[in-house]
């Protein structure tokens, strides 16, 4: 489970512990790019409008972050997820050599980094469960961008559970049991 911008592994651990399926272990990688003004770490930095696509420099940081996470992953099946930037990294991991080991995705308050690439690859990959959560009042990742992301999976025929809520850029704890249930289904699918 990967944290968002300005997050840390330690900040992600409590949520991950609540969501982990029985018999599974938790890994919360930590991004390596220090946030210059707000503390914590980022998987990539950008100075332009967050609604716009990433520039080449930010995309390079994404690729470097993914490479670092890949080095930390254990052997065996994986449920990959995260919040905000961390979930975007999780989704992008479908473009890597470990994609066959991913049995489910947990995408919380996020958008896709490379929508065209995701559209291109998903039809050729074995579908797996995706649980998606996004807030209607999200001021950092607008709901429309979150919907664009999850619709790419739906359009490719992947099984998706949508958990939309009326709050902002956050995990809605009122939907925690539904989220846990979907993650348990992922674990039970192997």
Map each language-model feature to its residues.
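A conserved short beta-strand
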Residues: 100-112
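Serine-hydrolase catalytic machinery in alpha/beta-hydrolase-like enzymes
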Residues: 1-75
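Flexible "cap/lid" loop of the alpha/beta hydrolase fold
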Residues: 38-44, 110-130
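Alpha/beta-hydrolase fold nucleophile elbow
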Residues: 74-82
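Gly/Ala-rich beta-loop-alpha elbow adjacent to hydrolase catalytic centers
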Residues: 82-86, 90
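C-terminal catalytic histidine-bearing segment of alpha/beta-hydrolase fold enzymes
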Residues: 144-190
């Amino acid at each position: 489970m990967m944290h968002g911008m300005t997050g840390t592994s330690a900040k992600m651990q409590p949520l991950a512990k609540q969501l982990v399926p029985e018999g599974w272990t938790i890994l919360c990688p930590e991004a390596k790019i220090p946030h210059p003004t707000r503390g914590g770490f980022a998987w990539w930095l950008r100075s332009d409008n967050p609604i716009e696509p990433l520039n080449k420099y930010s995309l390079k940081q994404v690729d470097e972050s993914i490479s670092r996470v890949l080095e930390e992953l254990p052997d065996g099946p994986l449920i990959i997820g995260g919040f905000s930037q961390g979930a975007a990294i999780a989704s992008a991991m479908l473009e890597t050599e470990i994609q066959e080991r991913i049995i489910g995705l947990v995408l919380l308050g996020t958008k896709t980094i490379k929508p065209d690439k995701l559209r291109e690859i998903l039809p050729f990959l074995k579908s797996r469960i995706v649980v998606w959560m996004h807030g209607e009042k999200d001021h950092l990742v607008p709901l429309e961008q979150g919907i664009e992301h999850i619709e790419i999976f739906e359009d490719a025929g992947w099984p998706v559970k949508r958990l939309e809520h009326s709050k902002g850029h956050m995990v809605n704890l009122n939907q925690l049991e539904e989220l846990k249930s979907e993650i348990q289904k992922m674990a039970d699918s192997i």
